[in-house]
């Protein structure tokens, strides 16, 4: 069978998300409410969990072919990929392969440098990661989000991707999604956070 592709040449995101998003808002609310009652958690958590899964799929399957590789890490990716733990989270942790940003450097290489040289290399890696996260990655996730909302017959401007203003390293994104569940106390915000960087070790 042929695999559907995005305009940039990468594989398309899972069409099941579009099927669900195409349902009437009331039906989606009922689905979130039913799941929340079964799992004993606020319906806003269920809604956010859907968008966490959507974001993981958009990063993994919706990226342009030939772009920098991503290492998915942390409890959110672990729970979604392998079901080893059960958790609700708003954060997705990823590491960008330094080699693919043109800043190849393993831990041993960095340890051999003097303090000044090491800081320069780490600053260069950080700058490359910032440029990728706030440039191509942000644009690609926004494109996938707009496509998903349009395909579902929803307002394509109802979702947006923006830089996280609270991240001093400027390597995190917030994916704001169109909320259909009831308003809560503001504790569960309708946004999924992508925390990224390129300094972390790629091996466990």
Question: Could you say what each language-model-derived stretch is?
Answer:
Residues 2-204:
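Compositionally biased terminal segments of proteins
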């Amino acid at each position: 069978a042929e695999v559907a592709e995005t305009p940039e040449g990468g594989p398309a995101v899972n069409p099941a998300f579009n099927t669900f998003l195409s349902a009437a808002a009331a039906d989606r609310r009922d689905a979130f409410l039913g799941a929340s009652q079964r799992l004993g958690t606020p319906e806003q958590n269920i809604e956010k969990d859907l968008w966490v899964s959507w974001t993981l799929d958009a990063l993994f399957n919706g990226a342009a072919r030939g772009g920098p590789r991503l290492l998915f890490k942390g409890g959110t990716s672990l729970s979604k990929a392998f079901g080893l733990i059960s958790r609700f989270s708003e954060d997705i942790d990823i590491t960008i392969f330094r080699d693919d940003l043109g800043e190849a450097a393993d831990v041993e290489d960095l340890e051999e440098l003097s303090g000044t040289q090491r800081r320069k290399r780490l600053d260069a890696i950080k700058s490359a990661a910032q440029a990728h996260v706030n440039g191509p990655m942000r644009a690609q996730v926004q494109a996938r989000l707009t496509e998903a909302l349009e395909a579902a017959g929803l307002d394509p401007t109802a979702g947006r991707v923006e830089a996280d203003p609270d991240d001093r390293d400027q390597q995190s994104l917030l994916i704001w999604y169109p909320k259909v569940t009831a308003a809560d106390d503001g504790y569960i915000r309708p946004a999924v956070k992508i925390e990224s960087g390129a300094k972390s070790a790629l091996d466990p």
